[in-house]
Design a protein with these regions (language model features):
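Alpha-helical repeat scaffolds in large eukaryotic proteins
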Residues: 29-36, 53, 57, 104-107, ...
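Low-complexity intrinsically disordered segments
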Residues: 21-32, 144-186
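Aromatic- and glycine-enriched beta-alpha-beta binding-site module
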Residues: 68, 74-116
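N-terminal amphipathic/basic-hydrophobic helices that include classical n-h-c signal peptides
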Residues: 1-13
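A glycine-rich, hydrophobic loop/mini-helix early in the fold
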Residues: 46-85
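Basic/polar, acidic-poor N-terminal "presequence/leader" segments
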Residues: 10-44
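Alpha-helical rod/repeat scaffolding segments in eukaryotic adaptors/tethers
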Residues: 42-45, 49, 88, 112-122
Length: 186
């Protein structure tokens, strides 16, 4: 009986350990490299991602690396990973929407600055966010995108402070609105 109880305690303590943002980025980078090299299966990666995105810092670290990095994971998401991301609920939807807004606005910023490489990187993140949002829970995505759209185009709602925090201007907000509509068009 003791080994079972010990195993349950160990499992519980592992679940209680939430990575910092920095740790989450490092762990995610290692996992994606293993997955890209076919050293771990879609299912193993999905289980790990499910655990990672259970905390806000874990999810933030995961998305920074997976959306902006060189791994092709976000370009061809395995069903098992989609299932874990959908199962993570509103937190993943929220971060995906915020990443969509930020990458879209930064693409405008980099275009203005004439930095084509950075613009392309921001556009890739934006495109990955659009595709991801099309795969997540539709009702949650719709509600969250409507909230962002209200702030970007009508300067109302909860996301006004988020957009103001980053100092986005009218052209950037219009681009964010266009990206929101791009999710719906898919």
């Amino acid at each position: 009986n003791r080994p079972i109880a010990l195993g349950q305690e160990l499992k519980r303590s592992m679940a209680d350990q939430q990575p910092t943002f920095q740790q989450a980025m490092e762990i995610t980078a290692a996992w994606l490299q293993q997955w890209d090299n076919e050293e771990i299966s879609d299912e193993v990666l999905a289980d790990r991602i499910g655990e990672m995105v259970a905390s806000r810092d874990g999810a933030r670290g995961f998305f920074v690396v997976s959306l902006a990095g060189e791994s092709v994971l976000m370009d061809r998401l395995p069903d098992a990973v989609v299932g874990q991301l959908r199962g993570a609920g509103a937190g993943v939807v929220d971060l995906s929407v915020r990443n969509l807004a930020m990458s879209t606005a930064m693409a405008v910023h980099h275009r203005r600055a004439g930095d084509e490489a950075q613009q392309a990187g921001s556009e890739r993140v934006s495109s990955r966010c659009i595709e991801l949002l099309r795969l997540l829970e539709p009702a949650e995505v719709k509600e969250r995108l409507e909230q962002l759209l209200a702030a970007a185009l009508d300067n109302r709602g909860e996301d006004v402070a988020f957009l103001e925090k980053w100092g986005y201007d009218a052209e950037q907000k219009q681009a964010i609105g266009d990206s929101v509509y791009a999710v719906a068009e898919g």
